[in-house]
């Protein structure tokens, strides 16, 4: 059964990344003509007491939303695309994105995100690095068996990809994980820049070419018909050498050539020229798809990705919210919406198969599961992305929304109503709560709704009005939590200026048995965390602690995020360096009491860590050194 609880509000048809066109008639032969949405958007414009300009939206059954151009996703063939303007979206949130510090995901969370990515319509899901650990292998395999075999009514099913270094053990492990998907892919890589050859691999150019050629051929020999090859650090590699090694892996059977700007050093003009040069000078390039993978070290990942697509790349590698190692990766939402807004006008008619109205919900899921908060001014999905505070901008928006809005919030699935609709409060019932959650895009099962309803009533008793932001915080705290090894039942805090703070905490274990502990600390949170530690008995170090108010006012709900590292050295293998890295675990909590939300966050992080420990208790990995010669 599908465990994801997110859906885009009132959606049924895919968005194919192009500006709105006149409505199709009912007699249109477009395969999407029967999927028009029968709803109408109503906009309420108001000024808050802080002088901030807000736009609220609601939906009512009436006339259709603006339709989408009748461009179809081409049938999937690994090494070619029938429509020269179609750009494949390769999402690596579950692999490169998870390498962000503190972004450790459980197997269930990875599966939820993969299902949501399929709803979004990504062409390829890089589900992980199977050789990193047994847990990673099982997560990729599960995604291949489930998401990789779920075909929608239009025949769409995502490619499920596993990453591997250029050695037989990694490649065999990747194939064993992804082979259960209808469309499996192996993505193998080896460095090609002089600095990597000299200091990391300690190999000659000829040796690396031989390894790359043999390993691509080996991947094909396993029965995998879809093999992607990446020359790591291509942005700093010698051009003639790139043309040579890429030509050799094409002859060996590669179907996609991914060109990574691994350290994010190139400028858009440079990266676009790199793609153009590879397209013009690589033997056999017409028989493969060119891909981009741009890191964000100089803040240019989105620009470089678009430049690469404009120069001929027809696959782009991205992550939700741009998460990833160091400064992150090219952001899916930015790249996709740039192509949608400017594809026809500037990029020669490029388009994607992404249903953009699932963007906000996918972004929220990744944010909650990873614990990595999206900055307010983040393009497309940031809290301020559609806020207007300047008086001049407000005046323009009141006169015509197009003066300062290049896309509508509805295009990305953003819902902001309630200002002109039903106000939720202490007298609201379960049905009203469920309806509003559905409008916001959240579908909860009966158990989740029941638990949330009583938390909603508790908040409503203390607040005159429960806002959408409050609801989203409560939903996130209820359903975006790891499987409970420990559950917070009750707690009591005594604090003040006369002495040490004291805390009594009651937790329930997975069998329902209650445990109570008391402790003192330098503050209420410190005392509570020490009491939790006395019960759980799993040593951990608190690395980060942050808190923010979801809404304004003294009665605001607070969300807390913590990042911990287990003292028992939970580790996995870094896909790029091959080194063993210590895993960190994040947790989030929400509540009107900041100490309670803090303890919920800490218990959530501990549950993640304990869940990882359980999954890897029989770990049987043997990491290969990055300079090992494949057999």
Curated annotation (Swiss-Prot):
pH dependence: Optimum pH is 8.5.
Extent of the transit peptide: 1-46
GO biological process: L-leucine biosynthetic process
Gene3D superfamilies with a match to the protein in the record: 1.10.238.260, 3.30.160.270, Aldolase class I
Top-level taxon in the UniProt lineage: Eukaryota
GO molecular function per UniProt: 2-isopropylmalate synthase activity; lyase activity; metal ion binding
Domain Pyruvate carboxyltransferase: 87-360
GO-annotated cellular components: chloroplast; chloroplast envelope
Cysteines paired by S-S bonds: none
Enzyme class per UniProt: transferase
Disruption phenotype: Plants do not show any changes in soluble amino acid content.
Pathway of action: Amino-acid biosynthesis; L-leucine biosynthesis; L-leucine from 3-methyl-2-oxobutanoate: step 1/4
Catalytic activity entry: 3-methyl-2-oxobutanoate + acetyl-CoA + H2O = (2S)-2-isopropylmalate + CoA + H(+)
Residues the record lists as binding a divalent metal cation: 96, 293, 329
Principal cellular location given in the protein's record: plastid
Pfam families membership: HCS_D2, HMGL-like, LeuA_dimer
Cofactor: Mg(2+); Mn(2+)
Tissue expression profile of the protein: Expressed in roots, stems, leaves, flowers and siliques.
Subunit structure as annotated in this protein's UniProt entry: Homotetramer.
Protein name per Swiss-Prot or TrEMBL: 2-isopropylmalate synthase 2, chloroplastic
Gene name of the encoded protein: IPMS2
